[in-house]
């Protein structure tokens, strides 16, 4: 879930016609034609698309987005069949299922599904993985440039310290930043009580003076360059920044972090269902997952790939957040329209 900044309200449920056969012809691997993939920016290596095309003969047409809401809006604004595959996060999947926007997956075509760690299967947002399979996940952690920050940071709450004025890069993601504020106060990231949200807003706005930059696309850049000394950014971005600047460290907040999992899904009305299934199954191959993790080192749910990567991945806590960190965290959930309106107003006030 890489970038999720634009707050939109849940649209009314839309009816989409079922794709005839619902994958009934997908039992054999497709080997020609094309597939239209709509994914996060800086999240799937070009080399993976190239290798898939070479191996299968299927041309991959790639479009990108910077937030779940951006993706949802674009899919709804385009004609049905414009995109075959999307890569939504946990909470967005729940919404898209409710709006009948996703095609059921042909499990017989997913011969590589057994490579996924059982811990990441059968999620609450898609019981039985009827519509989705995991790609990558991670947490919103704290990046600290120890050469510029003298004090120890251990929590989301520490980010509100006035001494950090003008030093923060934070995700351009309303659910992440508001959720982080809620967690720092002992509340849920999915808080709906207007009275509690008023308390959260009051604290949220005190963060404004500390924020130098909102960036979800490449927040590591500000950390690597030294323009920002502290960040509330995705764990993989911290891992990449640590490779460039040895003074940068990762801190997992003691309150428990924002946790996410992004998942492959096929849109209703897909014109290339068989090719889409072939692509998703390819992404579940261990070698493919290794290539992905080498370039974008997020939490890898592919157990076979993790075994191949060895200690460089498994013992790097920025690339591979410890199990206890994940267990202490919280996933974002869908919220009702009235609550989303409050969140939107809070976000607008923070950024104005």
Where are the model-predicted features located?
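Periplasmic-binding protein-like
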Residues: 197-206, 244-268
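Mature extracytoplasmic/periplasmic domains
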Residues: 267-327
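Extracytoplasmic ligand-binding site segments that recognize negatively charged/polar headgroups
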Residues: 45, 66-68, 82-227
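Loop/turn elements at helix/coil->beta-strand transitions in domains of secreted/extracellular proteins
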Residues: 33-34, 56-58, 81-84, 164-168, ...
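Conserved C-terminal helix/tail region of periplasmic/extracytoplasmic solute-binding proteins
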Residues: 323-352
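A ligand-binding cleft/hinge motif common to bilobed small-molecule-binding domains
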Residues: 93-95, 230-247
